[in-house]
Amino acid sequence: MNLELNKSTGNLFVNKSEFFFNNEQFISNNIFLKKHLKVNGFDTYGFEVVFFECNFSLNIIFKDGDFVRYFFLTFDEDCYDDTCLKKKLVELSGFVTKEVNIKPKKQDWKSFFELEWGSIELNAIRQDYSITMNIHNV
């Protein structure tokens, strides 16, 4: 499914309809739902989405019916380059980068986005370094 972001509110939309990520009943009954896992009392719901022209798994977590958080996880080849990720977020969304940290790190590559009401935190972890960018609405 194609996911869009309202840059002024941080709300997510699918086909021009708001995607209520903080409502478990809406999430659990959504026709696009791909997976549901329950681990240690936490319910995780997974969706396959296209967001900022990249393929992501959108994961939404609830605890006892209360919204906890959501994040995007990607292994998309088009998102492997941190410059590409930054360009997509900054140029396509109108967000500006406030902070970038790069440090050596020995881990398998993964990247995830956390979105909370107009603020995106990007953590890209590769085999040789990790990048953290805090990106906020202009």
Residue ranges and their predicted role:
Residues 1-102, 120, 127-138:
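Short helix/turn-capping signatures at newly exposed starts of structured segments
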